[in-house]
Structure formats: C-alpha cells, structure tokens
Amino acid sequence: MRRSDGHEETSEFLPMTHSRSVSAASQTSTDSSLSTESLFPREQKPFPNAMGGMALADDDKYRDLEDGEAEQSEPFLSSSKKAATGGGRARRIFWILVLLCLGGWLLAFVLFLTGGRANYQTASDALQAHGADSALGSTSTSSGKPVTLHQVLGGQWNPRYHAIGWVAGPNNEDGLLVEKGGDEKQGYLRVDDIRSRKGNNTGRESRVLMRKPIVHVDGQAIVPSNVWPSPDLKKVLLISEQQKNWRHSFTGKYWVLDVDSQTAQPLDPSAPDGRVQLALWSPASDAVVFVRDNNLYLRRLSSDSVVAITKDGGENLFYGVPDWVYEEEVISGNSVTWWSNDAKYIAFFRTNETSVPEFPVQYYISRPSGKKPLPGLENYPDVREIKYPKPGAPNPVVDLQFYDVEKNEVFSVQVADDFADDDRIIIEVLWASEGKILVRSTNRESDILKVYLIDTQSRTGKLVRSEDVAGLDGGWVEPSQSTRFVPADPNNGRPHDGYIDTVPYNGYDHLAYFSPLDNPNALMLTSGEWEVVDAPAAVDLQRGLVYFVGTKEAPTQRHVYRVQLDGSNLNPLTDTSKPGYYDVSFSHGTGYALLTYKGPSIPWQAIINTHGDEITYEDRIEDNAQLTKMVEAYALPTEVYQNVTVDGYTLQVVERRPPHFNPAKKYPVLFYLYGGPGSQTVDRKFTVDFQSYVASSLGYIVVTVDGRGTGFIGRKARCIVRGNLGFYEAHDQIATAKMWAAKSYVDETRMAIWGWSFGGFMTLKTLEQDAGRTFQYGMAVAPVTDWRFYDSIYTERYMHTPQHNPNGYDNSTITDMAALSESVRFLVMHGASDDNVHLQNTLVLIDKLDLSNVENYDVQFYPDSDHSIYFHNAHMMVYHRLSDWLVNAFNGEWHLIAKPVPDESMWERMKRSLRLLSP
C-alpha cells in the first residue's frame, strides 16, 4: 500500500525490475505479427543483466592474502642463526620479539575473522517481516540456504510465464488462441478455443495448422524459429535461419505453408535464399508485404512472382524497416510498415540516412559483418560502420509514404504545419477506417506533439491536434504505440470514429477519448494523482468498456481496471485490497484475457472471462510450483518498502535486509539504481536477482530509491530533471544514503553504489557530487560519461540539443576528477563493441582521470561485447567481478592498496630493533 507518513511497510519477498536501457532482451517478433515466442508457453529468459553461469565469491582469496603474509616472514626465519651470534641477551630479546610478533599476528587474524568478515556472516536473530501474502507462506526468513549467484545468473529464480497468441477466427470469433506442442495427431501448431480447455462443449474444435515442427521444401528440411498464421488461418508464414541484427531486428529465410496440403514454398520463389528483414500478412490473407535489402516487396499468393514496391533502397535509404536509432529509441521494434484494415493500402517509412555520421564499432575476435577478410588481412579487426546520430548531428530524415495495392502506386501526402525534415520524429502511425490514418509526430527535441489526420483516398491531410508539452510542465513526449482506434457505432452510442490516447492531465498521465478523429478536445476517461501504464490495454466495442493497467493504488503496484467510454464506472478487475503487480493480455474480442500476477508473492497466470460484471476464472495455466519449493528451501532477503521525502518530493524506496537481520549489528550498504527518465526500479514484482544474492549470500543491505526523474510519481517530479540530467537524481541518492548512514544498524564507513548504463552514469555522477562524503565506493557498468556521446533522439528528448543547452551538457558530463578521487575506490567496466553506449564514454573518462593524476579506480574491458556484455562468457565475468570487487571493498582491501609503499622486510625491521635495544 502507498504510504505517505514515511513509516516502514513490510512486504513479501518483492522484486526489483531491470530497465530496458540496462540490457533489454531482444524481441524477435514484429509488432503486428505472431511468433512462436509470443504465442506459446515459454520459460522466461533470465533478466538481462544476470544470465549465464558464474562461480561464487568465496573465502579462498582472503586465505591467499594471509598466506602471502606468512611468506613475507620467511627471510627472517632463514636468517635466525646470524642473530643468535649476538650473545644470550640478544637471543632473549630475539625470542621475546618473535613471540610478540606471533601474538600480534594471531590477534590480528582472530579480529579479522570475527570482525572484518562478520559483515557477510549472518546473525542469530531473524526479523519477522512477512505477512500472510508472503512468498514463503510463513513469517520468517531465518531458515534455508543462501541464494547463490550461479542460480541467479542461470535463471533458476526466474518465474515461468506463458504468452498466449490470441487470434480472431475467420468469422471474427472470440476466445481463439494458437498453441504448439503435441504429437502429429494433435498437431504441432493448432488453433484452440479457450472454452475447450476445460471440456466445455460450447468450444470449437481445434484446427491443426502445422502437423509437424519440421517441413520439407524440395528435399530441404525447414526448422522454423517463428511462425505467423494468416488471418483466415489457411496459411502460415515461417522463418528459418534467423539471425539477429540489432536489439529488435533480425533477418531470415521466409516460407509460406499451406495448411490443407501441409506443403510449403519460399516467400519469393525466384530468390529462395534471399534474407528477408520483415514480412507481414495482409488483413485479407491474400498477400504478404516484405522487406529485403531495404526495399519493399509485395507477394500475392495467387502468383509466384513478387512486385517491387520500392527500388532505390540501399545502404543509406530504408523502406519499411527502421534504422538503428529509430529501432532503439522510437519504435522499439523492427517494423515501420502498416497495412490498412481493408488491405487496400500500405503505409511505411522512408528513412534517409545519407547525412547521418558513421560511428565505427570494432570487433577483435568475431566477424559480425559476415565478410571473409582477404588473404593477409585476417589480423585486422572487423569494423561495423553504424549510422549513429549524436546530439546536434544530423538525424535521419523520415517520411511517411503510402502504397495503393490495387493501383500499384507509391505516393505521399503533404500536410500543412508539418515539422521540417530535420525537425521531425514520427512516433506512431494508426490506421482508422475508410483509408484514414492518424500520425503522431514530435519536433526534434520531443516537446511539441502534433497529430495529423490523413485521407489516403483523397490524398489530403490536416493537423488535428497540437500540444506544447514543454510549455505545459517543462516535460517531453515519450514515444509510444499504444493509441487505440475506436470505430463509429451509432447503435452503441458512438456516432463518429475516435481514438484513445494517453495525455498529461493535472500533473499525471491519463486516458483521453477523442471523437470525431479531428476533434482536438478530449473526454477524460481517468484522472487523479496516479497514472495509466501503456494504456489502453483493450477496448470492448460492444459494451463500450476500456481496459487498462494503472498505478491507482500505489506507484509500485499495477492493477487492471476498466472504465466506460464516457468516463464513468471505473472499477478494478484485480484484488486491490493487498499489494499486487498484474499484467494482462486480452483476446481479440476482449471477452477473455490472460491475467498475469507478477508479485509480490509467487507469480501465477490464469485465463479469465470478462463477459460479466465481475471476472470469472476459466483456467489456471501456471502456478510456478518450482519457485514455491525454492523459496521454502532458501533464505531470501527481507524487503522493506517505505517512502522518503527529499526536498518535498515523496520517493519510493525498497531495502533488502539479509536473512537473520540483527538490528544490533552494523551492516555495509549497497545502493543499486537505474534512474533514467520515466523508468522504475522499485516495484512489487517477485524477483530474485543480483541484489538478492548480495543480501542473502554476502550479508549486505541493498537499498534502491527511485529518485526524481523516474516514472509513476507524477510529472512534476519526473520533468524537473530535463536539461540537467544527473543533478537532482544524484542529489536524491545522496540524501537517501545519508538517511541510511544515520541508522543504528548501518556502517556508514562502508557504503557503495552501482548501476548499469544510465545507472552507470548515475553511479559516477553520484560519486562526483558526493565527493566521498557519503559513498566510499562505486561500480559503473557501460556508463554514459558525456551526453554528447549518446544518440540524439534519446538525449535531446531530455537535454535539448547541445546548441540549445550547452551549459546543461557541461553540467551533466562527468568532469570533476578531484571529487572522484575523494572516493576510496571505484570500478568501471565496458563492452569494447558496445553499439549503444560507445566505449568512447569510458575512454574519455580515463583520459580525464589520467590528466588529473587520479588513480583510485579499476577498469575492465570486454572484447566484442555489446551493451549487455555477453560475448565469450563475459556476462559471467562481469558479475563475478562485481561480487568480488564489492567484497574486497567492504573488507577494507582497497584501503590497503590506496597509497602503496615498499614493504621493508621483517628481518630488516628486526635488525633495526636490535640495534635500538643494544647497550
């Protein structure tokens, strides 16, 4: 529950999320198609920054150091006879000194074991911090084994989730889904009625789409990695030999399977080996539009030939697929091609990158370009020249074009009041009815939104809505593709077409209904001091209901709600009487949904029926029984949720306490953060991650605070960071850390902070602003160190252009090396082939450190690794290094090496002592 009094709120074993920018898992399906990953039960991939195996940090390292100390005494022992020649008095003095040395060494050793290492051993008393809804099902975490890093990195603590590929039947039937698995009789790929899963006689019989998981074409075995059934369910589009490009994009060989005959043919029979970047079914199921070599093609199934829609695509000109920066920062997908609902038109982007500067990314071991070097050139790195616009540099020029399928004609529509070519970012395209299409665009700095309505039949367009968001609250427009078209239905009280969009309203993001399409004035569907999330989720056109996920109960929670299209009768579908974090996926007609409970207790999934006033549960499809067993067997950290107030802003905090937490002890504290604009790291999902390992196995407290700039705490707190990234965010981390340093159970001399990507930037910015007064240590992975080095679309959204805001860029850059030198020590790690946050960031930082004679840092590079740092076991090594480095920090090892001096041998010290004692 949301608390405003600042009191602690105990909870179940609640998780923390991982921001996309840390290292988002790649999607492999298009936004408008279905794939095997999105259709079928699957094991959720381990969270992006903790995959792979990894050895635990153990005590061997510290025993080795002790052994080294013993070795240093060997010269003294081997030289003892020489000392004995000085007579009996000298011998007595000698043995007294020996005993004193040995006694001192033993005392230091005992103190080291009982004191120095107590920080990661558990105490005897357990904090009773779990209620009836606990993931453990008990009120104690005192029993069980510690969480291991190997388990976390191997994904053993990840909940198992299923995704349902809802499809509309050929006659618009609701409740149909695509499933895979089973023998040849059942069919490998089939369409089932959700009502048939429980033996309901009203359900339709299954329809087999693919009998076997492998199909043969001219004797060649095709093993598809993704599938896309046609809307009429008579064909299936297959992809094989799929290869990843960037985060969302990929290429592969495409095939069309006929359901009746179970035979397949290449998508383009004239080029069966051609690698295709994108393929999309026509809503009429009679054609496929696809992209190859950055050109757009149409394959009508009635013919074996294809029609070239565009012909001049190439290295600098893209049709139908996004370039790197649009894929990463605007669309978050691999498709910028959209069929009209009546299949008469195709809208697509034309992206011109000619003026965009290139950035070279080098690969020293692998050759992602696929090019075989010429003889004698094998020892040179493979170089990918990426068109990467940095702040202030030319952006790609993106235009929206249209293809008339019947006339085989490409055209564009000029609209008055459009942004100039170098000042336009198209963030969403949405088809309406009768050839009309809505286009949402922003200016380059993403603080002015314009919505255009284009009529492709008359080839005219007009501006229908404009919002100056910067003038409203100093904020920005976040790209999204969640706007929903609502068709006219006079019988149901909708005389005109309309659409539902998310807009700023009284300081929070809420749902607004615009009807007719050219009406700039909205009917607000939601309001209040909370926000909707990626809304709406679905619209029930028959009953006039809008479904959405929101934070009405608390910023850290997600519940499912519905509201009438007139804004009345807003009610929750999920149980809001206790903390919860839900997600939902609706069937085509919204009569059914897959409800996913993600925490705080053990996650589960169920099919629900939404036809009545209250939901009914049709089928429980996942309860994560294996997680229940693991929770019972392992000692998970206690998570305490609370609010803190900094400069009048209420911020969400979660504190992970080690099992057997003893308030009489003094614990080291690790702060973990991401902190990017609009992000959220403190939430109520069940997660056992690297932070859980640190608390459970190492015995440290881990604190996360979502400071100003993060999401779901209101636009005032979010927008204040614009133009000066890092200042308020770091201030909030430091202010919260000072609160923790004052707690009786915290060792204020052992406090660290770490993060990845934006979190890496925030780690360095916090150390810079703090100058060693609160945090002694920091660990930054793949950090931005100067926002002039990051991509233009993301950076200018929050910082304006460098020409517009030079002082802001200067302030946000990591520049104060003297302040960094005040920390005890910090660690920086980076993938050498990072195409997202370029290695340039860390190299320039190192140069600044060198020029300032700063030496209190460690640095590690990982060859051929991108932003997620996976290449050749690198991900395992990253977390191994983080864990070991942190243990060394909190054990005081970095103090010992801070100012190294030659160590005089013990024998020389003894001789000097003897001379002083001699008469």
UniProtKB/Swiss-Prot annotation:
Topology check: give the Cytoplasmic ranges.
Answer: 1-92
Segments crossing the lipid bilayer: 93-113
Q: Name one GO cellular component term.
A: plasma membrane
Q: What class of enzyme is it?
A: hydrolase
Query: Signal peptide position in this chain?
Result: none
Official protein name in the record: Probable dipeptidyl-aminopeptidase B
Q: What is its EC number?
A: 3.4.14.5
Q: Basic and acidic residues bias located where?
A: 1-10
Q: What does this protein do?
A: Type IV dipeptidyl-peptidase which removes N-terminal dipeptides sequentially from polypeptides having unsubstituted N-termini provided that the penultimate residue is proline.
Q: Where is the composition biased (Low complexity)?
A: 21-38
UniProt gene name: dapB
Glycan-linked positions? 200, 352, 643, 811
What's in the keyword line of the UniProt record? Aminopeptidase, Glycoprotein, Hydrolase, Membrane, Protease, Serine protease, Signal-anchor, Transmembrane, Transmembrane helix, Vacuole
Active site per UniProt: 757, 834, 867
For this protein, what reaction is catalysed?
Release of an N-terminal dipeptide, Xaa-Yaa-|-Zaa-, from a polypeptide, preferentially when Yaa is Pro, provided Zaa is neither Pro nor hydroxyproline
Stated family: Belongs to the peptidase S9B family.
Q: Where is this region: Disordered?
A: 1-53
Its annotated compartments are: Vacuole membrane
Q: Give the bilayer topology.
A: Single-pass type II membrane protein
Keyword Transmembrane helix in record:
yes
| Any one GO MF annotation of this record | serine-type peptidase activity
- Which loops or segments lie on the Vacuolar side of the membrane, by the record? 114-919
Q: What InterPro entries does the entry give? A: AB_hydrolase_fold, Peptidase_S9_cat, Peptidase_S9B_N, Serine_Prot_S9B/DPPIV
